[in-house]
Amino acid sequence: MKVGVIMGGISSEREISIQSGNSVVHALDKDKYEAIPIVLNEKEDLIEKVKGIDFALLALHGKFGEDGTVQSVLKTLGIPFSGCGPLSSAICMDKDMTKRILAFGNVRTARWVMVSSVDEIDYEKIENLGYPVFIKPNNGGSSVATTLVESKEAVKDAVLEALKYDTEVMIEEYIKGDEITCPIIDGKMLPVLAIKPKGKFFDIASKYEDGGADEFIVKLNEDLHKEVEKMALETYKLLKCDVYARVDMLVRDNVPYVLEVNTLPGMTKNSLFPKSAAGINMSFEELLDTIIEKSLKVNRE
């Protein structure tokens, strides 16, 4: 089977995507698959470069990759692909839409407000959230242009920085707690990982540099584990995820809050999903096998 590993792309996460893609190419079972690296440099590359492949393994991150656009093109071309479909991908990429759906489904998430320009900043609403707050692009990933803002004076600059990457900016309540992540594959939760960033929060350096954060499988107390699992699976269902996804949470005073959902989690040697899979003795190669097998079973018609 010819497996095209699609990486690169045009988002701010291009370099991370290439790291993921190269890791995947090296880890795929050579006896089962012919791995074909496909590096996208511009949108137009996609249709030409996927000709002749049997399956698209997506190692893309961010816009034009994680937002449902590539999934829609592949679906139109009749090429099966890994992970969530176009709708779920688009929803999960939009942080505001994700949180609206979670709130509708009574899944706990941090409070937030949205702005599209500095003129829309409502300092009273932000005061109501309580400082510090996180300010980030609505459709960004890997914590690109994400700022932890301690005071009113720093809000405008942080919003302007986030607006360089997106037309909408989220201003979100800061929940000081323990960050955990819940990888889900085929509707089942893998071991929960704790994330202890060396910096103030799990920023882009913490995520992708060796030693940027301590990440390890954590044993939660029984009641908390049950609630985390219930929330993670409910989130996965509400957002119509398929095959695999990663639900990120914060736990404050034994109370979990859903942060966001990654429909194409990183697949570098530092990535969280492979670390979690290793907790049930699933190798990186076996994880990729499972993703391909489950993705092929999902009806894309």
Swiss-Prot record:
Residues bound to Mg(2+) 2: 260, 262
Catalytic reactions of this protein: 2 D-alanine + ATP = D-alanyl-D-alanine + ADP + phosphate + H(+)
Cofactor(s) required, per the database record: Mg(2+); Mn(2+)
Subcellular compartments: Cytoplasm
Ranges of residues in domain ATP-grasp: 99-293
PANTHER family linked: D-ALANINE--D-ALANINE LIGASE, D-ALANINE--D-ALANINE LIGASE B
Protein's name in the database: D-alanine--D-alanine ligase
Organism: Clostridium perfringens (strain SM101 / Type A)
